[in-house]
């Protein structure tokens, strides 16, 4: 089953920080943009605590806290698809986390925070290769690879967003 990600620039919230989220089975990587939404930087790695059938746990609480404390205007959750665009069980986990973030934002009165799904094919592979190439040990790499993947997800989104916004024709 082909799974479609959101398109950067659609219903764009304008200037402000973005949060990139890489949902793994063990950890969740977070990356944050600058306020001009041009550059993604590693932010934090969380232990993944909330399962598909659980109520929200500390991982979702922490993501909500990061969003509110940093005045995030858009959250970009990686949508893990294979090279043909098909989804897997990982897609369910990513969509579940996105749903929980969206629900929490509404509950907290932060409905203006957009939660989008971005194509994340091969981001963990690219992040792992980049860490190895920069001399990061395998042990340390395990702790930061999720943040690095979140940076890849968010930076790809930011670059595509800028491209879309700069090439839009004004009627």
From Swiss-Prot:
Family annotation (CDD domains): YqgF (cd16964)
Example of a GO cellular component annotation carried by this entry: cytosol
EC nos: 3.1.-.-
Pfam families: RuvX (PF03652)
Coiled coil: none
Annotated localization: Cytoplasm
Chief site of localization: cytoplasm
One GO BP annotation of this record: rRNA 5'-end processing
Keywords for the protein's UniProt record, in alphabetical order: Cytoplasm, Hydrolase, Nuclease, Ribosome biogenesis
Tagged with keyword RNA-binding: no
Residues spanning the membrane: none
Molecular function via GO: nuclease activity
Biological role: Could be a nuclease involved in processing of the 5'-end of pre-16S rRNA.
HAMAP family xref list: Nuclease_YqgF
Family the UniProt entry places it in: Belongs to the YqgF nuclease family.
NCBIfam families attached to this UniProt entry: RNAse_H_YqgF
Protein name: Putative pre-16S rRNA nuclease
